[in-house]
Protein backbone atom coordinates (compact mmCIF):
# COMPACT_ATOMS: atom_id res chain seq x y z
CA UNK A 1 0.00 0.00 0.00
CA UNK A 2 1.39 3.34 -0.99
CA UNK A 3 0.82 6.21 1.45
CA UNK A 4 0.29 9.10 -0.92
CA UNK A 5 -1.78 12.19 -0.59
CA UNK A 6 -2.35 14.81 -3.23
CA UNK A 7 -3.41 15.29 -6.80
CA UNK A 8 -5.53 12.51 -8.24
CA UNK A 9 -5.33 12.07 -11.97
CA UNK A 10 -7.86 9.72 -13.47
CA UNK A 11 -7.04 8.63 -16.99
CA UNK A 12 -10.10 7.54 -18.86
CA UNK A 13 -13.29 8.54 -20.59
CA UNK A 14 -16.98 8.40 -19.86
CA UNK A 15 -19.27 7.71 -22.80
CA UNK A 16 -22.67 6.06 -23.22
CA UNK A 17 -22.80 5.31 -19.52
CA UNK A 18 -19.48 3.42 -19.49
CA UNK A 19 -16.55 4.53 -17.34
CA UNK A 20 -13.16 3.73 -18.86
CA UNK A 21 -10.81 4.75 -16.08
CA UNK A 22 -7.43 3.05 -16.33
CA UNK A 23 -5.17 4.48 -13.65
CA UNK A 24 -4.90 6.29 -10.35
CA UNK A 25 -1.91 8.61 -9.99
CA UNK A 26 -1.08 10.58 -6.85
CA UNK A 27 1.61 13.13 -6.07
CA UNK A 28 3.86 12.26 -3.09
CA UNK A 29 3.23 13.96 0.23
CA UNK A 30 5.20 13.99 3.46
CA UNK A 31 3.25 12.32 6.32
CA UNK A 32 3.11 15.65 8.14
CA UNK A 33 1.36 17.30 5.18
CA UNK A 34 -0.98 14.32 4.96
CA UNK A 35 -1.79 14.76 8.65
CA UNK A 36 -2.33 18.52 8.46
CA UNK A 37 -4.44 18.35 5.29
CA UNK A 38 -6.77 15.59 6.52
CA UNK A 39 -10.07 16.05 8.31
CA UNK A 40 -9.67 12.73 10.11
CA UNK A 41 -6.57 10.84 11.29
CA UNK A 42 -7.18 7.65 13.27
CA UNK A 43 -5.70 4.32 14.21
CA UNK A 44 -8.19 1.53 13.58
CA UNK A 45 -8.76 -2.11 12.76
CA UNK A 46 -11.05 -3.17 9.92
CA UNK A 47 -13.69 -5.61 11.17
CA UNK A 48 -15.99 -5.82 8.15
CA UNK A 49 -16.74 -4.58 4.64
CA UNK A 50 -19.58 -4.42 2.14
CA UNK A 51 -20.08 -3.21 -1.40
CA UNK A 52 -22.65 -0.47 -1.88
CA UNK A 53 -24.02 0.25 -5.35
CA UNK A 54 -22.97 3.88 -5.74
CA UNK A 55 -21.18 5.31 -8.77
CA UNK A 56 -19.95 3.38 -11.82
CA UNK A 57 -18.12 0.67 -9.85
CA UNK A 58 -19.75 0.97 -6.45
CA UNK A 59 -18.38 2.04 -3.08
CA UNK A 60 -16.64 -0.13 -0.51
CA UNK A 61 -17.77 0.60 3.03
CA UNK A 62 -15.42 -0.70 5.71
CA UNK A 63 -16.60 -1.17 9.27
CA UNK A 64 -13.80 -0.28 11.66
CA UNK A 65 -12.96 -0.43 15.33
CA UNK A 66 -11.39 2.91 16.19
CA UNK A 67 -8.41 2.60 18.52
CA UNK A 68 -7.28 6.22 18.73
CA UNK A 69 -8.03 9.56 17.10
CA UNK A 70 -5.21 11.99 16.30
CA UNK A 71 -7.11 14.59 14.30
CA UNK A 72 -10.78 15.33 13.67
CA UNK A 73 -12.25 15.58 17.15
CA UNK A 74 -14.64 18.35 16.10
CA UNK A 75 -15.40 16.89 12.65
CA UNK A 76 -16.32 13.35 13.69
CA UNK A 77 -15.22 12.27 17.18
CA UNK A 78 -15.96 8.60 16.57
CA UNK A 79 -15.63 6.89 13.20
CA UNK A 80 -17.41 3.59 12.62
CA UNK A 81 -17.35 3.39 8.82
CA UNK A 82 -14.96 4.54 6.10
CA UNK A 83 -15.88 4.84 2.43
CA UNK A 84 -13.69 4.33 -0.63
CA UNK A 85 -14.15 3.65 -4.33
CA UNK A 86 -14.56 -0.04 -5.10
CA UNK A 87 -12.23 0.24 -8.10
CA UNK A 88 -8.50 0.76 -7.60
CA UNK A 89 -8.42 2.57 -10.96
CA UNK A 90 -10.50 5.25 -9.22
CA UNK A 91 -8.07 5.27 -6.28
CA UNK A 92 -10.13 2.83 -4.23
CA UNK A 93 -8.38 1.39 -1.19
CA UNK A 94 -8.12 -2.32 -0.38
CA UNK A 95 -7.81 -3.16 3.32
CA UNK A 96 -7.53 -6.51 5.10
CA UNK A 97 -10.38 -7.48 7.42
CA UNK A 98 -9.57 -8.63 10.98
CA UNK A 99 -5.87 -8.74 10.25
CA UNK A 100 -4.01 -5.45 10.83
CA UNK A 101 -4.34 -2.16 12.60
CA UNK A 102 -4.06 0.76 10.19
CA UNK A 103 -3.30 4.44 10.30
CA UNK A 104 -6.15 5.96 8.29
CA UNK A 105 -6.47 9.52 7.02
CA UNK A 106 -9.30 11.02 5.03
CA UNK A 107 -11.85 13.75 4.47
CA UNK A 108 -15.40 14.17 5.72
CA UNK A 109 -18.27 14.72 3.27
CA UNK A 110 -21.94 14.69 4.28
CA UNK A 111 -21.06 13.22 7.64
CA UNK A 112 -19.06 10.31 6.17
CA UNK A 113 -15.31 9.63 6.14
CA UNK A 114 -13.79 8.99 2.72
CA UNK A 115 -10.29 7.74 1.96
CA UNK A 116 -8.34 6.29 -0.96
CA UNK A 117 -4.96 5.49 -2.44
CA UNK A 118 -4.00 9.17 -2.47
CA UNK A 119 -4.46 9.46 1.28
CA UNK A 120 -1.83 8.49 3.83
CA UNK A 121 -2.87 4.97 4.83
CA UNK A 122 -0.41 2.50 6.29
CA UNK A 123 -0.30 -0.56 8.49
CA UNK A 124 0.44 0.56 12.02
CA UNK A 125 3.30 -1.92 12.43
CA UNK A 126 5.00 -0.42 9.36
CA UNK A 127 5.23 3.09 10.83
CA UNK A 128 8.52 4.23 12.34
CA UNK A 129 8.75 5.38 15.94
CA UNK A 130 9.30 8.94 14.71
CA UNK A 131 6.13 8.78 12.62
CA UNK A 132 4.13 7.56 15.61
CA UNK A 133 5.49 10.39 17.73
CA UNK A 134 4.69 12.77 14.91
CA UNK A 135 1.06 11.69 15.02
CA UNK A 136 0.89 12.32 18.75
CA UNK A 137 2.14 15.91 18.73
CA UNK A 138 4.94 16.85 16.32
CA UNK A 139 2.99 16.96 13.08
CA UNK A 140 0.36 19.16 14.72
CA UNK A 141 3.08 21.58 15.83
CA UNK A 142 4.24 21.88 12.23
CA UNK A 143 0.93 22.54 10.50
CA UNK A 144 1.87 26.22 10.12
CA UNK A 145 5.09 25.24 8.33
CA UNK A 146 5.31 24.42 4.63
CA UNK A 147 7.11 21.36 3.31
CA UNK A 148 8.54 22.19 -0.12
CA UNK A 149 9.11 19.23 -2.44
CA UNK A 150 12.39 19.00 -4.35
CA UNK A 151 12.41 16.78 -7.44
CA UNK A 152 15.41 18.21 -9.28
CA UNK A 153 18.45 20.19 -8.18
CA UNK A 154 18.94 23.01 -7.49
CA UNK A 155 16.21 23.52 -4.88
CA UNK A 156 15.87 26.36 -2.40
CA UNK A 157 13.60 27.47 0.39
CA UNK A 158 12.08 30.85 -0.35
CA UNK A 159 10.64 31.77 3.05
CA UNK A 160 11.41 31.10 6.70
CA UNK A 161 8.39 28.83 7.14
CA UNK A 162 9.62 26.27 4.57
CA UNK A 163 11.47 22.96 4.96
CA UNK A 164 13.07 21.45 1.86
CA UNK A 165 11.90 17.88 1.27
CA UNK A 166 14.51 15.96 -0.72
CA UNK A 167 13.45 12.31 -0.39
CA UNK A 168 12.66 12.18 -4.11
CA UNK A 169 16.33 12.90 -4.93
CA UNK A 170 17.51 9.85 -2.99
CA UNK A 171 18.36 6.58 -4.66
CA UNK A 172 15.95 4.97 -2.23
CA UNK A 173 13.07 7.16 -3.44
CA UNK A 174 9.84 7.79 -1.58
CA UNK A 175 9.16 7.23 1.27
CA UNK A 176 12.64 8.25 2.34
CA UNK A 177 14.53 9.30 5.43
CA UNK A 178 12.80 12.63 5.93
CA UNK A 179 9.38 11.01 5.54
CA UNK A 180 10.17 8.29 8.03
CA UNK A 181 12.11 10.18 10.69
CA UNK A 182 11.59 13.97 10.53
CA UNK A 183 8.96 16.61 11.17
CA UNK A 184 9.07 20.21 9.95
CA UNK A 185 8.54 22.39 13.03
CA UNK A 186 8.76 26.10 13.77
CA UNK A 187 11.87 26.73 15.85
CA UNK A 188 13.25 29.60 17.88
CA UNK A 189 13.28 32.79 15.83
CA UNK A 190 10.22 31.79 13.81
CA UNK A 191 12.05 29.61 11.30
CA UNK A 192 10.76 26.19 10.32
CA UNK A 193 13.33 23.40 10.11
CA UNK A 194 13.53 19.63 10.22
CA UNK A 195 13.38 18.14 13.68
CA UNK A 196 14.18 14.70 15.00
CA UNK A 197 14.39 13.84 18.69
CA UNK A 198 12.84 11.90 21.50
CA UNK A 199 11.46 14.87 23.42
CA UNK A 200 8.95 17.39 22.04
CA UNK A 201 10.56 20.60 20.76
CA UNK A 202 10.31 23.61 23.05
CA UNK A 203 11.82 27.04 23.63
CA UNK A 204 15.13 25.56 24.73
CA UNK A 205 15.79 24.25 21.22
CA UNK A 206 18.16 26.50 19.33
CA UNK A 207 19.18 24.44 16.31
CA UNK A 208 17.31 21.53 14.80
CA UNK A 209 19.13 18.53 13.43
CA UNK A 210 18.92 18.61 9.66
CA UNK A 211 18.85 15.41 7.61
UniProtKB/Swiss-Prot annotation:
Belongs to the protease inhibitor I35 (TIMP) family. It is found in: Secreted, Extracellular space, Extracellular matrix. Residues 24-27, 88-89 are annotated as: Involved in metalloproteinase-binding. Zn(2+) binds at residue 24. GO terms for biological process: negative regulation of membrane protein ectodomain proteolysis; response to cytokine; response to hormone. SUPFAM superfamilies: TIMP-like. Its main location: secreted. It comes from Equus caballus. Pfam families: TIMP. It comes from the Eukaryota. Interacts with EFEMP1. Interacts with KDR. GO terms for cellular component: basement membrane; extracellular matrix; extracellular space. Residues 24-143 form the NTR domain. Glycans are attached at residue 207. CDD domains: NTR_TIMP. The gene is TIMP3. This is Metalloproteinase inhibitor 3. Disulfide bonds join 24-91, 26-118, 36-143, 145-192, 150-155, 163-184. Residues 105-188 are annotated as: Mediates interaction with EFEMP1. GO terms for molecular function: metalloendopeptidase inhibitor activity; zinc ion binding. Mediates a variety of processes including matrix regulation and turnover, inflammation, and angiogenesis, through reversible inhibition of zinc protease superfamily enzymes, primarily matrix metalloproteinases (MMPs). Regulates extracellular matrix (ECM) remodeling through inhibition of matrix metalloproteinases (MMP) including MMP-1, MMP-2, MMP-3, MMP-7, MMP-9, MMP-13, MMP-14 and MMP-15. Additionally, modulates the processing of amyloid precursor protein (APP) and apolipoprotein E receptor ApoER2 by inhibiting two alpha-secretases ADAM10 and ADAM17. The record marks 37 as: Involved in metalloproteinase-binding. Keywords: Disulfide bond, Extracellular matrix, Glycoprotein, Metal-binding, Metalloenzyme inhibitor, Metalloprotease inhibitor, Protease inhibitor, Secreted, Signal, Zinc.
